[in-house]
Amino acid sequence: MTSPLLAIRGLRAAYGNIEALKGIDLDVQRGEIVALIGANGAGKSTLMMTIFGRPRARSGEILFDGEDITHTPTHELARLRIAQSPEGRRIFPRMSVAENLQMGADAAEASESEHAADLERVLTLFPRLKERLTQRGGTLSGGEQQMLAIGRALMSRPRLLMLDEPSLGLAPLITRQIFDAIRTLNQTDGLTVLIVEQNANHALKLAHRGYVMVNGLITMSGVANELLERPEIRTAYLEGGRH
């Protein structure tokens, strides 16, 4: 079996004296979608942020395509074509949709024709953005801002796309549209995706494999559709939890 595109081994991180990650092991193979689910405060977003050096790992290692990136500066991760759509979207509200997308493209080493093809791809995935190219990002709806955040990440031509709570605060219809776009990218382009989500139902239906995090620990992992059928998952995250 080939080595994972992303391999996390024994990762620990903390905020002051509070340990947020307690020895995390996680793999993402090339061409797969992996979902990391768990309740609010479980440490999911902290894991995503630790990959980008905020907070810094106290111990353990993060390997990308076999290269140790545990302490690699954030700007260097773009060179490796690791892209993130962070929780809360964090678009540039005063910039137009087109300018936001260009910010993502600036991180990619691509020709003009490749940039044009990338832009057309994003606008095909998210037609709403095409209608609003000259509109300021801050005037978009929440769902449109999420589409823009993902589109900006895609413009950097990522080998690994990391999505942090992409369904947060969105209507079910918009969530389905966004998850359908992610599925399309994976199926047609082979894009590798790590998605952090409280919405276990959507995330596990999208993913090939899943991990469950509780209080900074991975407590369960496996094939996504098998995790969906486990009674403890259904009780905690589907029937009695957020769905």
What are these regions (language model features)?
Residues T2-H243:
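Glycine-rich phosphate-binding loops of nucleotide-dependent enzymes
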